[in-house]
Amino acid sequence: LHLAGNVIASLIFVGAVGRWLGSGVAAGLMLAAAVAANLLTAAVHGPGHDSVGASTATFAALGIVSGLQLVRRWRLGPLRRRAWLPIGAGLALFAMLGVGERADVLAHLFGLLVGALVGVVVGLRARRRAPAWVQVTAGALAALSVAGCWLLAFTR
């Protein structure tokens, strides 16, 4: 049930990012933000902390959506007063879905925060979607990275 929730939420949030940036770039950014968040979590927890990272990736995607929306609203002028609402919405979803008895709360929080930072930076820099070859390359690298990690996990 937990995994199914992650898959559904990731599809929703990556789909939202994909509408703005393209699906390959969205998958690559989500993975990069999740990796950074998991590295931060590992640095805080130290050795011996195990984490699969699917939830972290879900919260990274939520953070990217929140960061992109913040920049979008800020640029619209009249909505500047409400520009921070997407960040608040992301934090509210984190409070509802990211904490729990056996949840890796720190990984979820770092996923949201790193994702929001990525979303803001990309939102400020990207003026249009990347070309198709970039989308395919980013998506393929993300998929190969995940497959490689699972291969390593199962062969150790």
Annotated model-derived regions:
Residues 1-156:
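A detector for small-residue-rich transmembrane helices and their helix-helix packing motifs
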